[in-house]
Amino acid sequence: MQLTVTNDVNGEVYGPLELSGDMMLMDLVALLEVDCAFESGKQQLYFNGKELKPDVEKTLEELGIGNDDLIVIRGQPVSSNSIANSTSAIELDDDAYVEQFRLQLLSNSALRNSLRMPFADIDSLVNDPQQFKTHMGPVIIQRRRMQSAMPTNPYGIPDEEYKKLMTNPEDPEHKKRLQELQDKQLIDEQLRNALEYTPEVFAQVSMLYINMEINGHPVKAFVDSGAQMTIISPRLAEKTELKRFIDNRFIGEARGVGTGKILGRVHQVQVKIETQFIPCSFVVLDSNVDLLLGLDMLKRHQACIDLEKNVLRIAGTETKFLGEAEIPKGTSFDAVGNPQPPVEIKESADHSKKKMKTSFTITPKVKPVKADNLLNNSSPMGNTGRTFPEKTIKQLMDLGFSRQEVIQALVSTNGNAEFAASLLFQ
C-alpha cells in the first residue's frame, strides 16, 4: 500500500511511502522517525482524526489503514518526561546514534525492508558496522541534525518563544500571541482542506460577456449587475457611429474603486441581442472596458442571469455567455478579479454658470411623469400650491431644464432635489 505523511510541525509532506499492510505500527513509527522527522516523545500520529499510540501492537491493516490514506504528525505540549528523554537522546554522539539505529534494523525486518528501495544492499550493510557507518551514517546524521534544529512545540515557532509564552499564558500579550498562533493553525488547516477537496475555488473565474450589435457592428458586452450605469468607451462609440450622438452637457466624473472621466451621454440607441432590438442608453466613459451592460439596463428590460444554463435572458430573448477563449483580452480588473465600474456618477451641464453635482447612487422610487404633462402644466406651483426654495429651483434649472419642468418634478418627488434631478434626466 501507499501512504502519505504530512508533518504539521515543519509543514512538510512526505510520500507516498510504499509499505506493507502487515507492517506493525511500531515499525512504521521507527520509519517515520528516520524519513519524516517524527519524534515519538514530542509528537503524535493521527489517522482519521484519531491518535495512533506508537506502543500498540497491531498491523496497519488491523488499524484500518489502507492504500492512499493520510497519516498526520502533530506536536504535543512539552512535558518534563519528554524533555528528559530528548536530553538523553541528544547526549548520544553521532557514532553511537548510528550504531543504535543499525542494531534496530537488525532486529526489525519490516523496517529494513522499507529501506530496501533507497539502499538495495541494506542486508549486507547492517551486518557490517563499518560499511553501515560509511554508507548510511551521513544520511542518518543529517536527519538527526534536521530533527534537532526543528521546533518541538505544536505551533512550529522557536522553542525560546514558546517557553516564554507558556511561562505565563494568562498574560494579555501572551494570550493574544497564542490566539494568533491557533488562528494560523486553523487557517493552514482550512487551506489544506480547500486544496484537497475544493481546488476549483483557486481557479480564475471568467467574467460574463455576451455578443450584441450596435448599428450593425458586432460588440462583446460585459454584463455586470454590480455596475450602476451602462457604459460605452469613446473608441467604441466612434467605431459604432455613435460619437455624433454624445450629449456633452453630461460630462462629469465617475467614482468607484478609482475615478474616470465622463465625456457625455448617448440617450437612446437600438442594440441587437440575438434577433431582438432593445433600446439602450450609454454613459460615455474613458475606460478599458469597451461596453459594460449595467444594472440600469438589466432592470429596465427585466434581465435574468441564469448561471445554471449559462445564458442571459433579457427583453424576451436568450443569449449564451461567451466562453473564456472568446472574452476580450486586456480588460482592466482589480486584485480580486472584478472590473472597476463607476459607483457614483456626477453630471453637470457645460452651459451652466454654477454646476450642480447629482449623485445617482440612490434610485428614486417615484411615479413616472409624462413629458407632455411636464411641458403643458401652466401652474408654476403645480396642483398642490406648494412652494420650493428658489435656490433649489435655480440649481435644477442650471442643468438645462425650464422652470415649469423643474417645479413639476419637485412636486412629483415631494421636494427632493436629487430625486427630481433623476426624474428630469429620464
Curated annotation (Swiss-Prot):
It is found in: Cytoplasm. The lineage of its organism: Eukaryota, Fungi, Dikarya, Ascomycota, Saccharomycotina. It comes from the Eukaryota. This is DNA damage-inducible protein 1. It is an enzyme of class 3 (hydrolase). The keyword Ribosomal protein does not apply. Transmembrane segments: none annotated. The keyword Nucleotide-binding does not apply. Keywords: Aspartyl protease, Cytoplasm, Hydrolase, Protease, Protein transport, Transport. It comes from Candida glabrata (strain ATCC 2001 / BCRC 20586 / JCM 3761 / NBRC 0622 / NRRL Y-65 / CBS 138) (Yeast). The active site is at residue 224. One of its GO terms (cellular component) is plasma membrane. GO terms for biological process: positive regulation of DNA replication; protein secretion; protein transport to vacuole involved in ubiquitin-dependent protein catabolic process via the multivesicular body sorting pathway. InterPro entries: DDI1_N (IPR033882), Peptidase_A2_cat (IPR001995), Peptidase_aspartic_DDI1-type (IPR019103), Peptidase_aspartic_dom_sf (IPR021109), UBA (IPR015940), UBA-like_sf (IPR009060), Ubiquitin-like_dom (IPR000626), Ubiquitin-like_domsf (IPR029071).
